[in-house]
Amino acid sequence: MGGDKLMPHVAGIRDDSREGSRISKRRGEIFREHHLPHLSAFPLVRDLVRQFITDGYTVVVASSAQSDELSQLLKIAGVSDLIAATASSSEASRSKPDPDIVQAALQRSGAPAEQAIMLGDTPYDVEAALRAGIAIVGVESGGWSAEDLRGAVEVHPGAAGIYGHYGESAFARLIRAGRLTSRIS
């Protein structure tokens, strides 16, 4: 859930109010100063993204993060050079679970929804993908369980789990079915 929805949901504060703007700005500062420097990539993320590309996927990232944070996160994950395009909350009027960011990423991929698969780690990702008409594979790396990710075509413990069982994954099945055009993360 993006900040535009989180503050009203949790604290009853509109993100576009004076107070909401100050809170959002400070949240970003705290994240960049205290948390971002300590983040590291999950195991096998780069290998998994390379596998997607080898198989012909166009990798597009759809994130509720601000564009400046997203570029830093992709560098930390070690995949910034492998990503064809991004769509962030900076470029959408509504964040997840609304489908705006996912639809923007899908448009950038050039793929129709039925030929794309999204990879997500929150219930908001699942809802956004389904509302955009895209199949989604869930990963439990976001702190959510398989039960929380209900609606995903399959759920894995993380990128390493997908990579380790790639041949049986929804990504490989799409390739075998001859329906491959793009993938959104």
Go through each PLM region and give its residues.
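Asp-based, Mg2+/Mn2+-dependent phosphohydrolase catalytic module
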Residues: R50-Q51, S67, S71-S185
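Conserved phosphate-coupling serine/threonine residues in phosphotransfer and NTP-handling enzymes
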Residues: S63-A65
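N-terminal helical cap/lid subdomain that shapes the substrate entry/recognition surface
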Residues: M1-R46, R50-Y57
